[in-house]
A protein has these predicted regions:
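Short, glycine-/aromatic-enriched active-site segment of Class I SAM-dependent methyltransferases
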Residues: 130-152
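A short SAM/SAH-binding and catalytic strip from SAM-dependent methyltransferases
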Residues: 95-107
């Protein structure tokens, strides 16, 4: 499993997140930022759902081979796509899940407006992954200083994510919480998959769950939610006009 993971343990995240979801056989599920598709294979085997294993960084061809080797190619479909440019029709999915990848794109104030159109009204969107137990509002805590880089400002607390989604008035938030002993599990997994990353390991050892851990959020698209139109281009017609008053 370690060789098939690009970040947090995908099965830990999938088990934790799905315990807060009502997945039924035959549902269509988007696994957004699926990495090497281990979570997608798990979702089908465990719940009998159809899964679109979608990722930008990892090869769809490689994921396709992994899916075939698992014998689930009739129900798990590898897709190479950017989370901001998804090749699906509106209201195609019953459920959308994102495991340890949503922070890379979901902090955008406009992103939920975009993503929610792909799930049916009443359908659920759930995320789980690395986050903060409390927000870091000013200076980086000293014990995290050697590890922290500017890209880690995408990490947030469960309460931050709740507010981020609630204010759109698109989702009814059903759960926003943290994983018990999440920091220790993060540390244990990182020691296995990246033992040479001493900066992160030392940060986790020193933190002991004060700031670092795993967060989870599940919301359901409101049936009366109004999604703004997605503007892909502005139609225009060129009419030649002088740029300066002195021009004919």
């Amino acid at each position: 499993l370690a060789s098939n993971s690009g970040a947090a343990n995908p099965l830990w995240m999938a088990e934790w997140l799905t315990s807060a979801l009502d997945l039924q056989r035959g549902m269509r599920v988007l696994d957004l930022g699926c990495g090497r598709a281990a979570s997608s294979i798990f979702l089908h085997r465990e719940f009998g759902v159809q899964v679109w294993a979608t990722d930008l960084w990892f090869s769809a061809a490689e994921n396709g081979q992994r899916i075939r080797d698992a014998g689930v190619e009739d129900s798990v479909f590898p897709v190479h796509a950017d989370a901001r440019s998804l090749p699906f029709s509106d209201e195609f999915f019953d459920v959308i899940v994102s495991l340890d990848s949503f922070s890379y794109y979901g902090t955008d104030d406009l992103y939920l407006n975009y993503l929610a159109r792909f799930v049916k009204p009443g359908g659920a969107i759930g995320i789980a992954g690395a986050g903060l137990m409390q927000e870091i509002d000013s200076f980086i805590p000293k014990h995290l200083g050697d590890w922290w880089t500017n890209d880690l400002w995408c990490l947030h607390s469960a309460s931050w994510w709740r507010r981020h989604w609630e204010r759109t008035q698109i989702m009814d938030i059903e759960i926003a919480d943290t994983m018990p002993d999440g920091c220790q599990l993060w540390l244990d997994w990182h020691r296995l998959i990246a033992p040479d990353n001493e900066a992160e390991i030392k940060a986790l050892e020193a933190d002991r769950g004060e700031y670092l851990g795993y967060v989870r959020l599940v919301g359901r698209r409101l049936t009366n939610a109004t999604l703004p139109d997605q503007i892909l281009s502005v139609p225009t017609q060129y009419i030649k006009k002088p740029l300066l008053r002195s021009e004919p």
